[in-house]
């Protein structure tokens, strides 16, 4: 019975200890790394937007031909 209670309290203790150790190891990116990540994310957003816009431009005339302009 005591082993079950110890195990029950040991799991959150280990979780807290591992979590706090992980947070201590994490470091903020420097300015150069932050700018490179931001550029990559912005490029991805722009490319995905352009792809969606091009697909929409192609889809509208095809839809009008197939549906008959309804």
UniProtKB/Swiss-Prot annotation:
User: In its UniProt entry, what is this protein called?
Assistant: Probable protein transport protein Sec61 subunit gamma
| Protein purpose | Necessary for protein translocation in the endoplasmic reticulum.
Q: From which domain of life does this come?
A: Eukaryota
- TM segment ranges: 34-62
| Main localization, broad class | endoplasmic reticulum
Set out the biological process GO terms recorded for this chain's protein.
post-translational protein targeting to membrane, translocation; protein insertion into ER membrane; SRP-dependent cotranslational protein targeting to membrane, translocation
How this chain assembles, per its entry, is: Heterotrimeric complex composed of SEC61-alpha, SEC61-beta and SEC61-gamma.
One GO cellular component term: Ssh1 translocon complex
Residues on Cytoplasmic side: 1-33
Topological domains, Extracellular: 63-70
To which protein family does this belong? Belongs to the SecE/SEC61-gamma family.
Protein topology in the membrane: Single-pass membrane protein
Kindly give the InterPro entries that the UniProt entry links to this protein.
Prot_translocase_SecE_dom_sf (IPR023391), Translocase_Sec61-g (IPR008158), Translocase_SecE/Sec61-g (IPR001901)
Which keywords belong to this entry?
A: Endoplasmic reticulum, Membrane, Protein transport, Translocation, Transmembrane, Transmembrane helix, Transport
Q: Which NCBIfam families match?
A: secE_euk_arch
Annotated Gene Ontology MF terms?
Answer: protein transmembrane transporter activity
Subcellular location(s): the record lists:
Endoplasmic reticulum membrane
